[in-house]
Amino acid sequence: MRQCASASSSTSRPPEAAGEEGKRRRRRRGWLLQAAAREQRSRFYIFRRCVAMLLCWYKYRNITPYNVVPLGIYGLVWFATMPKYWQCQTIGKF
């Protein structure tokens, strides 16, 4: 019977090419992790802003603003223009 040459020996790369491939994979993995971290950071930022907004709405729920205008996609978000002394003061950096 004839012996077949192994596929790995026919498609093997020089050691330096394999090292470059590993570097590219590690770079891509690092980029993917950075992208995921950026997305989580932005989601957390939005979450904090929403919590601050809800707390302000709860605190000032009995105060009627002078005018309310729709803002955002499909008018789902509302922005109330209030006198400066009525506006909620948030703690921390947003």
Swiss-Prot record:
Show the stretches that span the lipid bilayer. 63-82
Mind listing the GO biological process terms from this record? Answer: negative regulation of cell population proliferation; shoot system development
The way it spans or sits in the membrane comes to:
Single-pass membrane protein
Compositional bias of kind Polar residues: 1-13
Q: Provide the protein's localization.
A: Cell membrane
Region Required for DVL/RTFL small polypeptide activity, annotated ranges: 28-59
Q: What is its main location?
A: membrane
Q: Region Disordered: start and end of each range?
A: 1-26
GO-annotated cellular components? plasma membrane
* InterPro entries per record: DVL, DVL_RTFL_regulatory
What is one Pfam family matched by this protein? DVL
Q: What happens when the gene is disrupted?
A: No visible phenotype.
What keywords appear on the UniProt entry?
Cell membrane, Developmental protein, Membrane, Transmembrane, Transmembrane helix
Q: Which residues form the signal peptide?
A: none
Give the protein family: Belongs to the DVL/RTFL small polypeptides family.
- Name-wise, this protein is Small polypeptide ROTUNDIFOLIA LIKE 1
